[in-house]
């Protein structure tokens, strides 16, 4: 089930003026309708034509190209934007759209995993679906779910957890404990049937569900792994079709939150847990005693197994709050939030590498400053004064070395006669 990434000239009985008038009228109608749709949680029905409308796809294109607008496939699509968006719309409405082939890339930071990316046209389709249904599902989620949500994020999750750790640390008694839940190979083990059943409780639009089913149950590409296996351990022919989501898909982030919202609701409303924080598949629960958290752990383990067909791995643990813990890539205690040692070492190594490339002329100033800013962003919400001082020294030495080399080049040009008047 693959599709060429070449875009064809759309066939239409309308001339250019009629198309423009139709698009403008459709834009006005859709903006009003979508504002009504997102005004409150509801059953999602009769949504497909709005999702596939020109203004919806145009907004999806604007979202999909952020940070990627100068890539060849994006430039090619943008060059004939209106024609291509109309073509996408027609394919979605007549049911002829099929997912294109995934591009695969192995990444090793922070750990080795397989990232998959769809062709640009399919990313637009996913954005169109996401921007319509995600706000509706988001209203069903608990306050303390922090991944891939507006006004949330990993740093807010870290600060909320630290706030609660400080609260319980002041309570009388022998000291509280935390339960850190680690779901085994979460993205590779999501059960398609369970996910579609959860989506189907809220979505009654048949064409929308058919499209989501095509994204989840891709027959062209398996996303799942056998229990206990890592991506690099499983040969291509042994990947599973009935479980798993592609890391890199926008919809996978949304599906992950929707899937684990079932656990959130169970913990908050059935087990009545107050101190509960989740960032994607990283979950921390605070409890008065180790015995209390052991009971919670068994209840959660049973729910995950029976309802979501997931398992916890050996990293799941119960320890005293006073010992601190690692969460969202940070080391959190009641007093400080620090980077993990592995993160600190990675930043040092990467920073030195880009500084060396810049001083040697292998990296231009714009790219250099952009990558430096990216690394600074990793440190902004943690106590990293010593690390910043060390990196600042490396940075200044790189700048000085670059200026020295540029000055030497000017001197060489001047004395060789290339920079002065000829005799």
Model-based region annotation:
Residues 1-35, 118, 127, 232-242, ...:
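Right-hand nucleic-acid polymerase module
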Residues 38-83:
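Hydrophobic alpha-helical membrane-insertion signals
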Residues 67-75, 100-126, 140-153, 219-257:
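Short, conserved non-catalytic motifs in the polymerase core
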Residues 84, 91, 164, 168-280, ...:
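Conserved polymerase palm-domain catalytic core
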Residues 100-102, 277-281, 313-315:
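Short Gly/Ser/Thr- and Asp/Glu-enriched loop/turn motifs at secondary-structure junctions
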Residues 47, 133-188:
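Active-site-proximal segment of RNA-dependent polymerases
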Residues 78-98:
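Amphipathic alpha-helical blocks
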């Amino acid at each position: 089930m693959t599709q060429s990434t070449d875009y064809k000239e759309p066939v239409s009985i309308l001339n250019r003026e009629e198309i423009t008038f139709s698009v403008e009228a459709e834009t006005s109608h859709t903006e009003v309708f979508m504002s009504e749709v997102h005004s409150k949680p509801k059953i999602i029905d009769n949504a497909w034509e709005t999702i596939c409308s020109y203004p919806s796809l145009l907004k999806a294109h604007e979202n999909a190209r952020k940070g990627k607008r100068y890539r060849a496939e994006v430039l090619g699509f943008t060059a004939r934007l209106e024609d291509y968006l109309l073509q996408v719309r027609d394919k979605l409405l007549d049911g002829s759209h099929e997912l294109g082939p995934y591009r695969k890339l192995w990444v090793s930071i922070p750990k080795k995993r397989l990232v998959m990316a769809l062709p640009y046209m399919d990313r637009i389709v996913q954005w169109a679906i996401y921007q319509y249904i995600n706000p509706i599902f988001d209203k069903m989620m608990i306050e303390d779910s922090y991944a891939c949500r507006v006004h949330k994020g990993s740093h807010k999750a870290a600060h909320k957890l630290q706030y609660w750790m400080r609260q319980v640390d002041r309570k009388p008694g022998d000291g509280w404990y935390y339960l850190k839940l680690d779901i085994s190979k979460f993205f590779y083990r999501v059960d398609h049937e369970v996910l579609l059943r959860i989506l189907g409780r809220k979505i009654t639009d048949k064409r929308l569900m058919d499209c989501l089913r095509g994204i989840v149950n891709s027959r062209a590409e398996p996303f799942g792994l056998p229990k206990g296996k890592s991506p690099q351990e499983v040969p291509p022919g042994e990947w599973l079709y009935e479980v798993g989501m592609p890391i890199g898909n926008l919809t996978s982030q949304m599906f992950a939150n929707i899937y684990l919202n079932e656990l959130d609701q169970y913990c908050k409303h059935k087990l009545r847990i107050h101190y509960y924080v989740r960032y994607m598949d990283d979950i921390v629960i605070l409890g008065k005693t180790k015995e209390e958290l052991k009971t919670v752990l068994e209840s959660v383990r049973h729910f995950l197994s029976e309802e979501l067909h997931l398992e916890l791995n050996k990293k799941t643990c119960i320890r005293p709050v006073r010992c601190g813990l690692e969460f969202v890539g940070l080391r959190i205690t009641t007093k400080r939030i620090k980077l993990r040692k592995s993160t600190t070492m990675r930043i040092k190594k990467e920073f030195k590498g880009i500084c060396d490339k810049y001083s040697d002329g292998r990296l231009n100033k714009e790219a250099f400053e952009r990558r430096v800013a990216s690394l600074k962003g990793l440190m902004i919400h943690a106590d990293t004064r010593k690390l910043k001082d060390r990196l600042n020294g490396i940075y200044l030495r790189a700048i000085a070395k670059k200026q020295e080399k540029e000055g030497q080049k000017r001197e060489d040009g001047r004395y060789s006669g290339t920079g002065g008047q000829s005799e």
